[in-house]
């Protein structure tokens, strides 16, 4: 049934057409979806070579309207910083005992991990577990910090991390299908502006090669990458 629905949805998408961002989002919202609130995603192909250190594009941004998802945050901290994390709304706070749960019991009930710098000797041992899942705390993404309270609050409000994959593509969440089109658009243009700001100096020519929007169970819709604002 799901396969038939996807085929019907694909038939409504003009494969060779470049939709404006608004048109693409309106189309995705019109299509019959799954029985849950699907996630709307953006896939942005950049003209970069991720194998070169001077062309790695990564960072974080606050989506103006959030992601629509409640993210569970684990914090590695002790003492006053542990209390600060708890007060900010962290779901799990610990140190050696949290690392042991992850390492020995396979505990992975969180979406983001944050750590104070002094905890990285402990967290480092979890690299083979957290790394492949994209959960390893990193200073560049603001998840290795002494300001754990602020980090937790921002993540809870909709801060997302972006990073090009080996093909030079950014995959990120724009929100939920239940969001209105204007909210999704605002999130997309915030992402686009952030990627333009993060453009490596070494990149020549056209920077954003292509853009596509999709939903969890829906088709991909090609988007005109030149549109900066609607």
Swiss-Prot record:
<dbReference type="InterPro" id="IPR016095">
    <property type="entry name" value="Ribosomal_uL1_3-a/b-sand"/>
</dbReference>
<comment type="function">
    <text>Binds directly to 23S rRNA. The L1 stalk is quite mobile in the ribosome, and is involved in E site tRNA release.</text>
</comment>
<dbReference type="InterPro" id="IPR005878">
    <property type="entry name" value="Ribosom_uL1_bac-type"/>
</dbReference>
<keyword id="KW-0694">RNA-binding</keyword>
<protein>
    <recommendedName>
        <fullName>Large ribosomal subunit protein uL1</fullName>
    </recommendedName>
</protein>
<dbReference type="InterPro" id="IPR002143">
    <property type="entry name" value="Ribosomal_uL1"/>
</dbReference>
<keyword id="KW-0699">rRNA-binding</keyword>
<keyword id="KW-0678">Repressor</keyword>
<keyword id="KW-0689">Ribosomal protein</keyword>
<comment type="subunit">
    <text>Part of the 50S ribosomal subunit.</text>
</comment>
<dbReference type="InterPro" id="IPR023674">
    <property type="entry name" value="Ribosomal_uL1-like"/>
</dbReference>
<dbReference type="InterPro" id="IPR028364">
    <property type="entry name" value="Ribosomal_uL1/biogenesis"/>
</dbReference>
<dbReference type="GO" id="GO:0003735">
    <property type="term" value="F:structural constituent of ribosome"/>
</dbReference>
<dbReference type="InterPro" id="IPR023673">
    <property type="entry name" value="Ribosomal_uL1_CS"/>
</dbReference>
<dbReference type="Pfam" id="PF00687">
    <property type="entry name" value="Ribosomal_L1"/>
</dbReference>
<dbReference type="GO" id="GO:0019843">
    <property type="term" value="F:rRNA binding"/>
</dbReference>
<dbReference type="GO" id="GO:0000049">
    <property type="term" value="F:tRNA binding"/>
</dbReference>
<dbReference type="GO" id="GO:0006412">
    <property type="term" value="P:translation"/>
</dbReference>
<comment type="similarity">
    <text>Belongs to the universal ribosomal protein uL1 family.</text>
</comment>
<keyword id="KW-0687">Ribonucleoprotein</keyword>
<dbReference type="GO" id="GO:0015934">
    <property type="term" value="C:large ribosomal subunit"/>
</dbReference>
<keyword id="KW-0810">Translation regulation</keyword>
<dbReference type="GO" id="GO:0006417">
    <property type="term" value="P:regulation of translation"/>
</dbReference>
<keyword id="KW-0820">tRNA-binding</keyword>
<comment type="function">
    <text>Protein L1 is also a translational repressor protein, it controls the translation of the L11 operon by binding to its mRNA.</text>
</comment>
